[in-house]
């Protein structure tokens, strides 16, 4: 089991650490590396890809520049997308500067929670997640304003939808890799059969 982390911008090392820990908790060892993905060749052999937070217009440009747009769209593994990654996964982002992947049929509102200084943490309830509420870190996060075509809503706040999944993909408006709670990483891996 190899997990790739899109390493163009954002909290790459935090995702690597979280997925490494989640794989170990699920019984995988060094034979299951978590690697940085910077070009299409890096995706070879990956069963999953994390698209971290960062700045969605910048990540979008870098995905195009590095020739990753089509390989990610065609990727057969699961995608775990956080914050800006959630924006890239949507079909409708409302910003022509973002070349979204369109892998989840949903509309997002970029930076719905405001500016950087308005970032916050909150305990949210995630549908089907055992162990009580999930402590979520929101940093200029998006919200999903409309989920369509089988996109399952997992969590909401008063601003809107903040967690969704469909099939092998999960998209979150917050940063689970920053809080130390691996339950969403583990759920994602379990959904992939790991």
Swiss-Prot record:
GO biological process entries: glutamine catabolic process; pyridoxal phosphate biosynthetic process; pyridoxine metabolic process
Reaction catalyzed: aldehydo-D-ribose 5-phosphate + D-glyceraldehyde 3-phosphate + L-glutamine = pyridoxal 5'-phosphate + L-glutamate + phosphate + 3 H2O + H(+); L-glutamine + H2O = L-glutamate + NH4(+)
GO molecular function, one term: glutaminase activity
InterPro entries registered for this protein in UniProt: Class_I_gatase-like, PdxT/SNO, PdxT/SNO_CS
Highest taxon of the lineage: Archaea
Pathway(s) served: Cofactor biosynthesis; pyridoxal 5'-phosphate biosynthesis
Cellular component terms (Gene Ontology): cytosol; glutaminase complex
UniProt-annotated catalytic positions: 83, 175, 177
Record function comment: Catalyzes the hydrolysis of glutamine to glutamate and ammonia as part of the biosynthesis of pyridoxal 5'-phosphate. The resulting ammonia molecule is channeled to the active site of PdxS.
PANTHER family to which the protein is assigned, alphabetical: PYRIDOXAL 5'-PHOSPHATE SYNTHASE SUBUNIT SNO, PYRIDOXAL 5'-PHOSPHATE SYNTHASE SUBUNIT SNO1-RELATED
Complexes and interactors: In the presence of PdxS, forms a dodecamer of heterodimers. Only shows activity in the heterodimer.
Name of the protein this chain belongs to: Pyridoxal 5'-phosphate synthase subunit PdxT
Organism: Methanoregula boonei (strain DSM 21154 / JCM 14090 / 6A8)
């Amino acid at each position: 089991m190899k997990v790739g982390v899109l390493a163009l911008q954002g909290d790459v090392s935090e995702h690597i650490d979280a997925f490494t820990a989640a794989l170990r908790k699920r019984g995988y060892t060094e034979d299951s590396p978590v690697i940085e993905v910077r070009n299409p060749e890096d995706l070879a052999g990956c069963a999953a890809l994390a698209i971290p937070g960062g700045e969605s217009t910048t990540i979008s440009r870098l995905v195009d520049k590095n020739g990753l747009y089509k390989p990610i769209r065609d990727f057969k593994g699961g995608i775990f997308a956080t914050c800006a990654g959630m924006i890239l996964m949507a079909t409708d982002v409302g910003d022509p500067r973002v070349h979204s992947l369109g892998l989840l049929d949903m509309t997002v509102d970029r930076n719905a929670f405001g500016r950087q200084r308005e970032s916050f943490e909150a305990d949210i309830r995630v549908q089907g997640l055992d162990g009580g509420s999930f402590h979520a870190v929101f940093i200029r996060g998006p919200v999903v304003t409309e989920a369509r075509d089988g996109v399952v809503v997992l969590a909401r706040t008063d601003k809107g939808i903040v967690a969704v999944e469909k099939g092998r993909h999960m998209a979150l408006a917050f940063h689970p890799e920053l809080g130390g709670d691996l339950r969403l990483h583990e759920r994602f891996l379990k959904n992939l059969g790991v």
